[in-house]
């Protein structure tokens, strides 16, 4: 996994993850915009295989925010979460009469950005 960060946003990328991008996107759509703790709880109880690499990338992004930017993990929110297609792994299955059928095993690239939530306490003046 490669990692990078900006001033108020920390990012993490998981590249060449085994699994199709569309199946990873359906999980990322559920956690986008949530807090770090809520996202971890949701990922723990989802019945999808793609939650494991997503959890690893999310924890890496939070570790980047904590170590590189000095942000508190309890105040972090998932600002962006994307899954893009990676190159397929090409495999071949032997078939009848000496033929071979191609099998493409999909890979994807997962990118997650976390940023600090801005808690605004607006007091009404009477």
From Swiss-Prot:
GO terms for biological process: translation. It comes from the Bacteria. One of its GO terms (cellular component) is cytosolic large ribosomal subunit. GO terms for molecular function: rRNA binding; structural constituent of ribosome. InterPro entries: Ribosomal_uL22 (IPR001063), Ribosomal_uL22_bac/chlpt-type (IPR005727), Ribosomal_uL22_bac/org-type (IPR047867), Ribosomal_uL22_CS (IPR018260), Ribosomal_uL22_sf (IPR036394). Gene3D superfamilies: Ribosomal protein L22/L17 (3.90.470.10). Pfam families: Ribosomal_L22 (PF00237). Keywords: Ribonucleoprotein, Ribosomal protein, RNA-binding, rRNA-binding. Belongs to the universal ribosomal protein uL22 family. NCBIfam families: rplV_bact. Part of the 50S ribosomal subunit. This protein binds specifically to 23S rRNA; its binding is stimulated by other ribosomal proteins, e.g. L4, L17, and L20. It is important during the early stages of 50S assembly. It makes multiple contacts with different domains of the 23S rRNA in the assembled 50S subunit and ribosome. This is Large ribosomal subunit protein uL22. The lineage of its organism: Bacteria, Bacillati, Cyanobacteriota, Cyanophyceae, Synechococcales.
